[in-house]
Swiss-Prot record:
Listed EC numbers: 3.5.4.12
Originating organism: Drosophila melanogaster (Fruit fly)
Protein name as catalogued: Probable deoxycytidylate deaminase
Domain CMP/dCMP-type deaminase span(s) in chain numbering: 27-163
Reaction catalyzed: dCMP + H2O + H(+) = dUMP + NH4(+)
Cofactor: Zn(2+)
Protein's GO biological process: cytidine deamination; dTMP biosynthetic process; dUMP biosynthetic process
EC primary class: hydrolase
CDD domains reported in the protein's UniProt record: deoxycytidylate_deaminase
Active site annotation, chain numbering: E104
Residues that hold Zn(2+) according to the record: H102, C128, C131
Family label: Belongs to the cytidine and deoxycytidylate deaminase family.
Cellular component terms (Gene Ontology): cytoplasm
């Protein structure tokens, strides 16, 4: 049997896919925007689901949030629809906008008082003027968003006006990956007794 030199062995190992880093890993921006999208899945809003994620300069997630009613305000009692102005049954108190906390605001509130100065905000929908006020007040320096579908509405034009005035950068995130799949069956099911060490008990 021919002897394999150390140099040949190193050469063979270096050609193995397992000896190099995986190339299909998520880019940071895709990772954080995906976190926002996943957070949006928690929203009970039947029409609009928005998620947001705040990240510090070390690429650590500080807080996440999604649009929904304030804590302890029942999702089954408060209205999820928009009241139609001009209709005979118009009632402003039956409009969800009176009660919903936006994803960006929830993320900021969920930071539990931590300093957000210099952080980045990832959001699935461009922030409205009310959220822009909060973004500016807490010192978030950059906003990355997926959709700006309401760009022509005064609410969002006002948002951009404020962000521009104070130098908060905002840009649309262009994903490097169009699809990210979460498969809970990726990892084999573990023996529920294993974590308890029951398989090692001898009675």
């Amino acid at each position: 049997m021919a002897e394999v030199s150390a140099q040949d062995l190193i050469s063979q190992l270096s050609k193995s896919p397992e000896s190099h880093k995986r190339k299909e890993y998520l880019h940071w921006d895709d990772y954080f925007m995906a976190t926002s999208l996943l957070s949006a899945k928690r929203s009970k809003d039947p029409v609009t689901q928005v998620g947001a994620c705040i990240v510090d300069s070390q690429n650590r997630i500080v807080a996440i949030g999604y649009n929904g009613f304030p804590r302890n305000c029942s999702d089954d009692v408060f209205p999820w629809s928009k009241a139609k102005k001009g209709s005979q049954e118009f009632d402003p108190l039956e409009d969800k906008k009176m009660y919903v906390v936006h994803a960006e605001a929830n993320a900021i509130l969920n930071s539990n008082g931590m300093s957000l100065s210099g952080t980045r905000l990832y959001t699935t929908l461009f922030p409205c003027n009310e959220c822009a006020k909060l973004i500016i007040q807490v010192g978030i320096s950059q906003v990355l968003y997926l959709s700006d579908k309401y760009a022509d509405k005064p609410t969002y034009r006002a948002s951009k006006r404020m962000l521009d005035a104070v130098g908060v950068e905002y840009k649309r995130h262009i994903p490097q990956k169009k699809t990210i799949t979460i498969d809970f069956d990726t990892f084999p099911e573990e023996d529920p007794n294993a974590s308890l060490g029951l398989n090692e008990l001898h009675l």
